[in-house]
Swiss-Prot record:
It comes from Arabidopsis thaliana (Mouse-ear cress). This is Uncharacterized protein At2g39910. It comes from the Eukaryota. InterPro entries: ARM-like, ARM-type_fold.
């Protein structure tokens, strides 16, 4: 009796596996067809053919008729590679047409409903628990992440390596494989949201750290995007176990290529303010701030670099509070230079961050105060010739009013030289009327 029951279960398992294999074939056939028709000539220097890799991952009629973990994983990796190309301009992925990327993504979600417990677009908490507890489904991240980590690691280097080491590593394993694996890593992880992602921190963090430690900026960038998503979807307590290691990796990468500067700034600010939310005395605040300011000082006229920093730094400023006073000698020379930039975005962002700094510190015991008033007045006058003056001037007035509020007699003394300036009569009237 038991034998008959077990035999029936075995036959059912074989039948289900065979049906799933047929479904995987049907789902992948349109992808394979478009892929074969798509023109693609890999660059000789890359030594990697993305098209060949994709075709090798797709199931075919000659493979085993039973769908197993390996065949499901391969198709999932192919889908992730296709889907990740939608947000990439890298030569290894930019040739993939939009319709093929969309097809890869939709195919992944088709098979995920049958196979994966850790991927779900359903936000209902009970349904999520039900999916995770479904014993017939598999968790995909524990299967793919070790393989992707290995793919990234093969062309990585130890710290202190030089250009010759990079050449040797590329000869051993072309960096293209690491770039593709990093894109797959980023895509897989960013598809998993709360509350599922927390279960995989111990897998995601080592894999993303491997990407951050890689010498290729493209690989680093994908690792940073992965960490940003992780930090936004798990608690500070869950990240705290890896805090020092991850923050150290951030510091090591702040002086990075401009193409990934946006990611390293966003990640560094997000992590330090999340892991140490009410502890501006943490040495990580000083380390990260000093590294960022040093990178900005090396090329203060770099527009993209300064705009990125000004966009993302606000939470860091708020967390530092009065501890910002220790950074005045480095922050204000940059602010004074950027206030007179040609582009409106820089000027507006500087004024917004400047208002934050004044509000948090009240410019206590700082010799920077008189020059700050002078620079604001100078910018107010300059703005008369700018088309964006209606955006710039209200911000200047707000800062001047805040300075009068916090500095009192010192402000009146600094302003006395402008009291009779006919070009500033409306400014004086506004400051004193509004303040009173």
């Amino acid at each position: 009796m038991n034998f008959t029951k077990e035999n029936c279960q075995f036959r059912k398992m074989l039948s289900t596996s065979s049906d799933l294999h047929g479904r995987l074939l049907r789902l992948s056939e349109p992808i394979a067809e478009i892929l074969r028709r798509t023109q693609y000539t890999p660059q000789e220097s890359s030594k990697v053919s993305t098209k060949d890799i994709l075709l090798s991952l797709l199931p075919n009629t000659s493979s085993s008729r039973l769908a197993n973990e390996e065949s499901i994983k391969s198709l999932a990796l192919a889908c992730a590679l296709l889907a990740s190309s939608r947000s990439s301009t890298h030569e290894l992925l930019s040739w993939i047409p939009e319709n093929l990327s969309v097809m890869g993504e939709s195919t992944f979600w088709e098979i995920s409903r049958d196979c994966f417990s850790d991927f779900s677009s359903n936000s209902n908490a009970e349904k999520l628990v039900e999916l995770v507890e479904d014993s017939e489904k598999i968790e995909m991240l524990p299967i793919v992440l070790p393989e992707l980590k290995d793919g990234i690691e093969k062309s990585s280097l130890g710290k202190g390596s030089d250009a010759e080491d990079v050449s040797a590593a590329m000869a051993r394993t072309p960096v293209g494989y690491a770039i593709l694996a990093a894109h797959q890593l980023r895509w897989f992880v960013t598809q998993v949201k709360k509350p599922n992602l927390v279960k995989f921190c111990n897998l995601v963090v080592p894999c993303a750290l491997t990407a951050l430690d890689h010498w290729s900026p493209e690989v680093k960038g994908q690792g940073m995007i992965t960490f940003v998503h992780l930090a936004k979807n798990v608690s500070s307590g869950d990240l705290g176990l890896y805090g020092d290691v991850v923050l150290d990796a951030c510091c090591q990468n702040i002086a990075s290529d401009d193409e990934i500067w946006i990611h390293v700034v966003e990640l560094s600010v997000l992590l330090v303010t999340k892991i140490h939310p009410n502890n501006p005395r943490s040495p990580w605040y000083e380390k990260i701030m000093n590294e960022m300011l040093g990178h900005l000082e090396r090329q203060p006229r770099n527009k993209e670099r300064r705009i990125t920093w000004l966009r993302f730094v606000e939470p860091l400023l708020n967390s530092l509070g009065l501890f910002l006073l220790a950074h005045f000698r480095r922050i204000f020379p940059l602010f004074f230079q950027w206030m007179h930039s040609d582009d409106a975005e820089t000027v507006l962002l500087v004024l917004e961050r400047l208002e934050t700094v004044v509000r948090l510190t009240w410019i206590r015991h700082s010799p920077v105060f008189p020059r700050l008033v002078d620079e604001l007045v100078s910018l107010y006058k300059e703005s008369s010739m700018r088309k964006d003056r209606d955006d710039i001037r209200p911000l200047i007035l707000r800062i001047l009013m805040l300075l009068r509020q916090c500095k009192g007699l010192r402000f009146e003394s600094a302003w006395s030289q402008y009291q009779e300036d006919p070009n500033l009569s409306t400014v004086s009237q506004h400051i004193w009327t509004s303040s009173s």
